[in-house]
Structures are given as C-alpha cells and as structure tokens.
Amino acid sequence: MRLATAVCLAICLSQPAALAQTAQRPAKPLVGQPGKDAIWVPTPSALIEMMLDLAKVTAADRVVDLGSGDGRAVIAAAKRGANARGIEFDANLVAVATANAAKEGVSDKATFERADMFATDFSNATVVVLFLLPDLNIKLRPSILNMKPGTRVVSNTFEM
C-alpha cells in the first residue's frame, strides 16, 4: 500500500513539471493541420530560395510572408539581410517560427506576429510572399493592389 501511495504521489507531483516543459516548447506543427483560412503545408527550402531570387530580395527590402507558418520564408529572407515579417494566425506556429529564427540567429531581422492577414497592415512591404489557395489570393487582391508601385509579389503555386 505504501508503495502504491508513493508511486501515485510521484506521478502526481511530476505532472506540473511535465506541463511546464510542454509550455516552454511549442508543439511541432503537422503538415496538413487545419488553420483559420487554410491548412499548413510548408514550402520546400529550395522553392523559397527560388521565390526570393525571383523577387530579387536584398538587404534593402522589407519582406512580408502572409501565412508564415513555421517561418522558413521569413528566416530565408532575413539571412539575405532583409527585414522580414511573418503574419500567421496560429499562435503555436508563431511560437515555432520565433524559436526557429532564434535558432538560426536572425531574430534581429525576422519577426513574427499572430494576426489575421486580412485585418493587418502590411503596406510598407517591398516584397510579399505567400502560399495560399486561389480564393484567399483573390480576397487579398484589394490590399495588394493598394500597395506602392514596384512592390514585388510572389505566390507559390497559385495565381493572384
């Protein structure tokens, strides 16, 4: 009986520590997990590099990734010296992206915010990258058309 009580006590006392460890690390995102407007599917790094090349991203740019997920496009732009901003609705993905930027040493150039891309001002961007479905691209069209002339927009896979 004492052993059972001791085991039960040990298990109960260890739970707060386990919960604290979980709270410190964001959960690993799953490909295909549903989000507010779309499912999360990460863009391969090689394709991100091609998108940034196509936009001719330099250190003089302000890059915005709409639906930034785990932050890989923002981090890649920051590694090129650009000031890069990720707008992502999923708070866990924002935490993952922020941790990834810190791990890659670009936290000073890569920022992430939990926000609705349809209600957030990103008009100061010189480059916009996105990987969204066509209906979302169409919904974003008015915001993008109101951006400054010369703003480069690169959409992965789907037309604007």
Report each predicted region and the residues it spans.
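Conserved class I S-adenosyl-L-methionine
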Residues: 59-69
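S-adenosyl-L-methionine
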Residues: 21-61, 91-124
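A short SAM/SAH-binding and catalytic strip from SAM-dependent methyltransferases
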Residues: 122-139
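Conserved SAM-binding loop of SAM-dependent methyltransferases across substrates and taxa
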Residues: 70-82
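C-terminal substrate-binding/active-site "lid" region of AdoMet-derived donor-dependent transferases
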Residues: 135-160
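Bacterial N-terminal signal peptides
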Residues: 4-15
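Conserved SAM-binding motif I beta-strand of class I
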Residues: 83-88
